[in-house]
Every structure is written in C-alpha cells, then in structure tokens.
C-alpha cells in the first residue's frame, strides 16, 4: 500500500482537465530526402496534435510540522510537490539524505491528514498504517499534521 491516511480533515478537491485535438493521419506520407522519395509508414487512428494542452491546477493543503521540541511550522503545500520540498521553500529545515524514499532520514509520523508516498520503497505497510511517512517522497492529499524527526522511532 502506498497511501498513508490519518483521520481526514476536509479539503477541497480539484481534478485535472486535459484538452487535446485529434487529427486523422493518412496511411502513408511521402517524404523527400536528398532527391529521393520514400514512404514513411504511419499507423492509422487519431493523432494528438501539436496543440496538446494539459492543464491541472495544483490544490494547496495546509501542512503543520511539529518538531521534536514542540516547535510548529505551518505552510501551504501544493498536492504535486513533496512535503520536504515545500518545507524548504517555506524556510523550514528538515533532515534528509537520499531524497528518493530509500532511507529513513526524513521520516515523520502523521497524526492528521493524508499523503501519497507511492514513489517510496523503504517503509513497510505496517509502518505506513501507523502514520509513518518519508517527507522526501510524500505529496499532501489533504491538510496534514506531521511530527518530524522520527527516524529512530522506526527501529
């Protein structure tokens, strides 16, 4: 399981919308190269045009980080940005090492909210069920409260 969930706080949801235009492609197209004509095989069916536009507005979630000494930092984090990266942008220093979800240096424990940490492989399902997460590969999916500096709690 890759999604960790704590008691949920209400959060707005927004879906991504994709707009694209299709064009029919001919069965074959003649290309000339150095005076010679050659056929370029083309698969039949719809094609995405060069005007393909993907638009998805990131949803902002409030993230509260609680340090080992009780210090709290609160900031907004987009749902498409890692919590570690959003914290750094907000001026909050957190421990990290790999930035790839393959160690436990940035471990935290969530007491409220929901994150997506599907890119990680370090934590097992039991640890995630207990609310543990890795801030370097966790995207906020709802407002969150995360207790940081929890690496030693994992062992």
Curated annotation (Swiss-Prot):
[2Fe-2S] cluster binds at residues 98, 103, 106, 136. Induction: By nitrate. The keyword Zinc does not apply. InterPro entries: 2Fe-2S_ferredoxin-like_sf, 2Fe-2S_ferredoxin-type, 2Fe2S_fd_BS, Beta-grasp_dom_sf, Fd_pln. Ferredoxins are iron-sulfur proteins that transfer electrons in a wide variety of metabolic reactions. Residues 61-152 form the 2Fe-2S ferredoxin-type domain. Its cofactor is [2Fe-2S] cluster. Its main location: plastid. Keywords: 2Fe-2S, Chloroplast, Electron transport, Iron, Iron-sulfur, Metal-binding, Plastid, Transit peptide, Transport. It comes from Zea mays. Residues 1-58 form a transit peptide. This is Ferredoxin-6, chloroplastic. Coiled coil: none annotated. One of its GO terms (cellular component) is chloroplast. The lineage of its organism: Eukaryota, Viridiplantae, Streptophyta, Embryophyta, Tracheophyta. One of its GO terms (molecular function) is metal ion binding. CDD domains: fer2. Binds 1 [2Fe-2S] cluster. Pfam families: Fer2. One of its GO terms (biological process) is electron transport chain. PROSITE patterns: 2FE2S_FER_1 (PS00197), 2FE2S_FER_2 (PS51085). It is found in: Plastid, Chloroplast. Belongs to the 2Fe2S plant-type ferredoxin family.
């Amino acid at each position: 399981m890759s999604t960790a969930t704590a008691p949920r706080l209400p959060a707005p949801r927004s879906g991504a919308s994709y707009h694209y235009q299709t064009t029919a492609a001919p069965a074959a197209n003649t290309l000339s190269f150095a005076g010679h004509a050659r056929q370029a095989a083309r698969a039949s069916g719809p094609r995405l045009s060069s005007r393909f536009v993907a638009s998805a507005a990131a949803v902002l979630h409030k993230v509260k980080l609680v340090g080992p000494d009780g210090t709290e930092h609160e900031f907004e984090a987009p749902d498409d940005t890692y919590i570690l990266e959003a914290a750094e942008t907000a001026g909050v220093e957190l421990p990290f090492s790999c930035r790839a979800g393959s160690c436990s240096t940035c471990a935290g424990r969530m007491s409220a909210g929901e994150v997506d940490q599907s890119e990680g492989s370090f934590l097992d399902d039991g640890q995630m069920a207990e609310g543990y997460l890795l801030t370097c590969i966790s995207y906020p999916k709802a407002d969150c409260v995360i207790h940081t500096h929890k690496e030693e709690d994992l062992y």
